[in-house]
């Protein structure tokens, strides 16, 4: 069976684009978009490839995505080589099938069909594509957004193709995401011999009451759109490896996934007040990965709901759960941002796969969103 969405997805999967290596994926997408009359602007930074493409003028709907994928893990555990796309029992297998080369294929084919039907469409259709989402996300979408904002580029709506669905395509759309901030905390003590604790100051012992309080704290209660803020300790390191040395320092790394009830500044202030209360000698560094964002009901959310209902006869849940995505950068432009993509059950796993029929459905949903917003 000839299906342009599946064929393009297979083309992309064949390219081992381990983040941030694009491995030629964007050249394929650019060629398809240029054939439709899109203007292409590449914005390559270091080892990261990015492009911004647009067609038409006026109110702007952008489709955003990434060509990079995560490592495969042990390839011997895959039923088929991860970069040799295979269809078996109606499922398309391969690294990136769900996250997110399937979405990219669905977007581009949707654009081809849309332009064929509306060659003189009224609004502007755009694409923002990067090869740096899965790894550091430092030279990708965030840098493109900064460049677009610097020149006051218009962006009204953005559909991110992240795999948002859980059971069937379109059952969940993400209309926001929690913020993420990480603390790298070092508690300072005095190294010494375990037999002479009075001559040392054990930073692990010092840290434990403070860490207990951190874990027990209710940071907020969440709200209508977001679950309560969560704090998780990710790494703890101390000691020399010897059983007779009291360590001099204790390193603790912890991360907050926070709702719109808090800001990153409020979190930092609360943590530092807690550490001061416990009279610790410490140093702390913070890394903000993204602020929370929320897209309320409006034209984009309504268009997404309409498209899903039309093609899959279900009403999508609007959720803000999960990790961060590049939507956090795009939201800075004041755009309405929604994520809609395939089922995420196998993303980052061995034998990543997606229903071939889901990608065909997804492409039709994307096309209908285009028709509602920029036709």
UniProtKB/Swiss-Prot annotation:
Function of the molecule: Catalyzes the hydrolysis of N-succinyl-L,L-diaminopimelic acid (SDAP), forming succinate and LL-2,6-diaminopimelate (DAP), an intermediate involved in the bacterial biosynthesis of lysine and meso-diaminopimelic acid, an essential component of bacterial cell walls.
Query: Which metal ions or organic cofactors does this protein require, according to UniProt?
Result: Zn(2+); Co(2+)
Gene Ontology process terms (BP) = diaminopimelate biosynthetic process; L-arginine biosynthetic process; lysine biosynthetic process via diaminopimelate
What's its EC? 3.5.1.18
The taxonomic lineage of its organism, from the top, reads:
Bacteria, Pseudomonadati, Pseudomonadota, Gammaproteobacteria, Enterobacterales
**Annotated catalytic residues:** 68, 133 (proton acceptor)
Task: Kindly give the NCBIfam families that the UniProt entry links to this protein.
Answer: dapE_proteo, PRK13009.1
Q: Which Pfam families match?
A: M20_dimer (PF07687), Peptidase_M20 (PF01546)
Top EC category: hydrolase
Q: In which pathway does it act?
A: Amino-acid biosynthesis; L-lysine biosynthesis via DAP pathway; LL-2,6-diaminopimelate from (S)-tetrahydrodipicolinate (succinylase route): step 3/3
UniProt similarity note: Belongs to the peptidase M20A family. DapE subfamily.
**What UniProt keywords are attached to this protein's entry?**
Amino-acid biosynthesis, Cobalt, Diaminopimelate biosynthesis, Hydrolase, Lysine biosynthesis, Metal-binding, Zinc
Subunit info here reads: Homodimer.
Q: Where does Zn(2+) 1 bind?
A: 66, 99, 162
Q: For this protein, what reaction is catalysed? A: N-succinyl-(2S,6S)-2,6-diaminopimelate + H2O = (2S,6S)-2,6-diaminopimelate + succinate
The residues the entry assigns to the signal sequence are none
Any GO MF annotation of the entry = cobalt ion binding
Q: What is this protein called?
A: Succinyl-diaminopimelate desuccinylase
Q: List the disulfide bonds.
A: none
